Amino acid sequence: MLDHPLNSLGFAKPPAVTRVVVAMSGGVDSSVVAAELAAEGYDVVGVTLQLYDHGAALAKKGACCAGRDIHDARRVAETMGFPHYVLDYENTFREAVIDEFADAYLAGATPVPCIRCNERVKFKDLLQTAKDLDADCMATGHYIQRKMGPAGPELHSAADPARDQSYFLFSTTPEQLAFLRFPLGHLASKAETRALAARHGLPVADKPDSQDICFVPNGNYAEVIQKLRPGAADPGEIVDLSGRVLGEHRGVIHYTIGQRRGLGIGGLGDPLYVVRLDPERRQVIVGPKEALSTRIVPVREINWLGDAPLTSRSEWQVMAKVRSTRAPREAVIRPLSDTEAEVELIAPEDGVSPGQACVFYAPGDSRILGGGWIWRGAR
């Protein structure tokens, strides 16, 4: 069984008259959420979004919300006996996620499209659809926890650090959090999720996990960008910090901050890393590893989840995470407005890149205090 909140979902009425829309990607996580809720007697409605043309070149096997996954979600619904609907969100997804993804790379940034998808599609349009279906709440298969605090629902990291998805969900607003449920957040491991899937006889119990960037075939994001923005891979110069030309690159979109391999400028002594991208000059700037060291990070579009307003203090002591694969580090937030701040990392980080998220956590706690987008000018 899932944890106690799922037995009631926080509503003072029987499960049979509590409608829950489950966002079903076709993977094992959201399938288990739907199956557990259905088994507990809730009025479950499964919804899967078709986010792109799964017959076109952008689709790939094992990608979230592609043709196979829609089929798998439907099979789970049939197994558990609840209705399932497929909604065509291709245009919305392209406008809200894919176009910005391509434009960000053209601007020399390294975007995180999964965050934008949660923010602009799943927790916006799909959540509104759930309300239109008279649902009491919407449940997803994300590994994150929703806990009740003194001021209302709070967002907390998942119990399993290896599966925690809080970095990708920092932009969840208090209003959205009031309507959302995350039944898997308390589980200790993915093995528990698969065991629940097997217990329910779900056809996806052994299905491999999907890739993060669902619309990028084989991880070749540059190929996708070139299809969306012809001419995006114009070659240019690789230069060092003094401006000396060291070689030629294949297009700025092929490079990210901190990259060392694949530069094609070997034999120059000490290893060189990409420290900056200048798309206007079509330059890739490289330097020694110490040139990547960053302590001051400008952050904008902040979604603040603390109980007191962000600007109520001149400084906030937090733990900050500047990449999804890195652990949170000690930091100080210095607000500039309700949505902008300067974040000082107590210990420098390498490879801080525009387009990534900077997510804030309460010191000594699992609570997510919000986050924002890293902007140019990190130093």
UniProtKB/Swiss-Prot annotation:
Keywords: ATP-binding, Cytoplasm, Disulfide bond, Nucleotide-binding, RNA-binding, Transferase, tRNA processing, tRNA-binding. It catalyses: S-sulfanyl-L-cysteinyl-[protein] + uridine(34) in tRNA + AH2 + ATP = 2-thiouridine(34) in tRNA + L-cysteinyl-[protein] + A + AMP + diphosphate + H(+). Its EC number is 2.8.1.13. Disulfide bonds join 117-214. Gene3D superfamilies: Adenine nucleotide alpha hydrolases-like domains, HUPs, Translation factors. The active site is at residues 117, 214. Pfam families: tRNA_Me_trans (PF03054), tRNA_Me_trans_C (PF20258), tRNA_Me_trans_M (PF20259). One of its GO terms (molecular function) is tRNA-uridine 2-sulfurtransferase activity. ATP binds at residues 23-30, 49, 141. One of its GO terms (biological process) is tRNA wobble position uridine thiolation. CDD domains: MnmA_TRMU-like. Residues 163-165 are annotated as: Interaction with tRNA. GO terms for cellular component: cytoplasm. Belongs to the MnmA/TRMU family. NCBIfam families: PRK00143.1, trmU. PANTHER family: MITOCHONDRIAL TRNA-SPECIFIC 2-THIOURIDYLASE 1, TRNA 5-METHYLAMINOMETHYL-2-THIOURIDYLATE -METHYLTRANSFERASE. Catalyzes the 2-thiolation of uridine at the wobble position (U34) of tRNA, leading to the formation of s(2)U34. This is tRNA-specific 2-thiouridylase MnmA.
